[in-house]
């Protein structure tokens, strides 16, 4: 079975593009938005609606395989690929990537995905945008699965020499800034890893001495115990801090380690990472 056509359409992601540089510089929350001017190239505001590109591969038997090109929240930060805007990258996919796919036999996901992952921009010589690689290889995986009349997990297991799990896999849930109410939802639904919490600002989220995050971890500990159905529910507490500990403690590793020990003690018996 072959790929006959590549179709792209603009979509939205589940979250936002946030200008991390502006947020770390002190941009203040305004509801779901931020007040201030963007500092990272490509941003027209500090928070923008996340954009995606849906890639549809039309197969020779009429089936359609799908993949979604999407980038991370903090696009353009710390050497990451630039802001992923659909209007900029749909033409790019059609001109650069699609010709590499059309007419290809769907015999191996690993082989074709490897080619896409190693593709370089003909003008810059750099690897193509991570969001494109992410979404196009998704579509290839779906296409190979459809060509073999099986599920994507079976294709991965076969080609990479592993087994499809017969047990539920832990899912990491993300609260965004609504870290209290959304944590409740996660606990009530039995999320295995929670809540992310988006601790991306020292003064408003971590606290100048770490006091705000410590208070939140204590609350989270108590909330799990209050809402869980039984003691068998032991979620992992995963907090993303975006380098704020280093800022708050002036990169003093001993102070950071002591603070992390304090957080772990507050989270116990739940594992904190």
Residue ranges and their predicted role:
Residues 47-49, 135, 163-165, 231-233:
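Solvent-exposed loop and beta-edge segments used for protein-protein assembly and interaction
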Residues 58, 142-144, 157-186:
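Glycine-rich, aromatic-flanked loop segments that form ligand/cofactor-binding clefts
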Residues 171-273:
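Metal-dependent enolase-superfamily TIM-barrel catalytic cores that perform enediolate-based chemistry
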Residues 39-42, 52-53, 138-139, 152-158, ...:
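Short alpha-helical segments and helix-capping/turn motifs at coil-helix boundaries
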Residues 24-36, 144-148, 152-157, 161-165:
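Extended, Lys/Arg-enriched charged tracts that mediate electrostatic binding to polyanionic substrates
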Residues 1-56:
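Short, Gly/Pro- and small/polar-rich lid/capping loops
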Residues 126, 130, 134-138, 146, ...:
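Short, amphipathic alpha-helical segments
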Residues 58, 64-150:
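Metal- or metallocofactor-binding catalytic centers and their adjacent structured scaffolds
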